[in-house]
């Protein structure tokens, strides 16, 4: 993920929201930007800045995860680390090549017991999340966006199942689905 003044501001704002007893981890792929962020945010005891690829970073556990770079797919580690009622905000984007800004939609996922509620919030154009992009997922996401109806997404399914007409985007580790409610008993 690429850091900017916006990312630094977002981390600082989140740190204020969680307060002095909370903990915020900022992740930056670029060594110099991570060092600068660490320096600029040193006054916030509850902030930790890591220099690593956010696309491959798996937090231990989290109430909230905010990805500020476009991905073609969700990572199992991000979903696995969400505590109950935890939220994940992620721009799902398609791009003409892996290093250009992608266009897509901001996805909100909420972990609710055994299920994940999901819906798109708004269109977005943003820089790429290097470790969470691949061409196959890019094409699958592009095809789903061409079909439209992104507003019909209501849940994220993690159980293995065959693609069906309720799958807006069917992937290897997740499916963005138009199904609502308790989906744990949905037949394949």
Question: At which residue positions do the language-model features occur?
Answer:
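Conserved nucleotide-cofactor-binding alpha/beta core module
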Residues: 1-103, 111
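SAM/dcSAM-binding transferase cores
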Residues: 96-188
């Amino acid at each position: 993920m690429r850091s900017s003044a916006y990312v630094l501001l977002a981390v600082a704002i989140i740190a204020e929201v969680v307060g002095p007893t909370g903990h915020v981890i900022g992740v930056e792929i670029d060594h110099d930007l991570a060092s600068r962020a660490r320096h600029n945010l040193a006054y916030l005891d509850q902030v930790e800045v890591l220099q690593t690829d956010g696309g491959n970073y798996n937090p231990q556990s989290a109430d909230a995860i905010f990805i500020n770079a476009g991905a073609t797919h969700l990572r199992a580690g991000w979903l696995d680390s969400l505590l109950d009622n935890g939220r994940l905000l992620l721009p799902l984007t398609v791009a003409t090549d892996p290093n250009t800004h992608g266009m897509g939609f901001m996805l909100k996922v909420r972990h609710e017991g055994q299920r994940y509620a999901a819906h798109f919030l708004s269109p977005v154009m943003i820089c790429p999340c290097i470790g969470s992009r691949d061409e196959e997922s890019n094409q699958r996401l592009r095809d789903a966006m061409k079909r439209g109806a992104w507003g019909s997404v209501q849940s994220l399914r993690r159980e293995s199942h065959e693609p069906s007409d309720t799958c807006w985007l069917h992937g290897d580790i997740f499916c963005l689905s138009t199904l609502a409610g308790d989906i744990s008993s949905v037949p394949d």
